[in-house]
């Protein structure tokens, strides 16, 4: 494969991995530990 194709595939995989990790953190098991500032300061 050409170098440009390998670089493009690597960057794409990195972005997909980061997006997957962000979704897991936001909606998966670790989301229970996140604080909600709107719930802390109810009026």
Swiss-Prot record:
Topological relation to the membrane, as annotated: Single-pass membrane protein
Family, as annotated: Belongs to the PsbN family.
UniProtKB keywords: Chloroplast, Membrane, Plastid, Thylakoid, Transmembrane, Transmembrane helix
Organism encoding this protein: Bowenia serrulata
Stated name of the protein: Protein PsbN
Keyword Ribonucleoprotein carried by entry: no
Residue intervals passing through the bilayer: 5-27
GO biological process: photosynthesis
Domain of life the protein comes from: Eukaryota
Entry's Gene Ontology cellular component terms: chloroplast thylakoid membrane
Subcellular location: Plastid, Chloroplast thylakoid membrane
UniProt main location, coarse: plastid
InterPro entries cross-referenced by the UniProt entry: PSII_PsbN (IPR003398)
Task performed by this protein: May play a role in photosystem I and II biogenesis.
